[in-house]
Amino acid sequence: MTLLEMKKKVLRLIEEINDKSSLLTDDPDIANKINDVINQIQNEIARIKKIPAKEELEVAKGDEIDFSDIAKDLFQINIVRGVENDIIGNTINFYGDGTAKIYYYKYPKQITADTKDSEFTFDLSTDVLEIMPYGVAGDLLKSDISASYGQVYSNRYEQMLQRLDPRFHTGSIYLEGDDTSEFL
């Protein structure tokens, strides 16, 4: 999904869309803050439904690598394979030579006022992108005192977040051998 598509979803939801306007809305307050709000909501959701990534690094025994040296968008290490290691704080200590496969979670690409709506695509999964418009709508309308729509959208967003499955897959097990009936 592009940023343009997300904005249209949100603005249709809150009934503020104007397809003829280059800003997509006639409300200057919404136009001024929608990118910031979308960015804030995507960062919030990415801490729940994390975005997986992988880097491979050639390492030597005794190397100590800071998380920030692996990837600038690194949020959290998942697992490191290929070379014996320990993770202490924000540093990976390696106890051998070889190729380290570093599986981690990353922050999403950031949205600014200069982000091109039709060129930006989200890193987030489809289930997350279906929840986001409610969080954005709730934040955009939270200061609208004439109606409680902001609270309605915020409540719906919170309900949907609680049902969000943070997993990308479930584990599986494979049994092999002559007599596996004792395991069944």
What are these regions (language model features)?
Residues 1-184:
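Glycine-enriched, solvent-exposed interface loops adjoining structured elements
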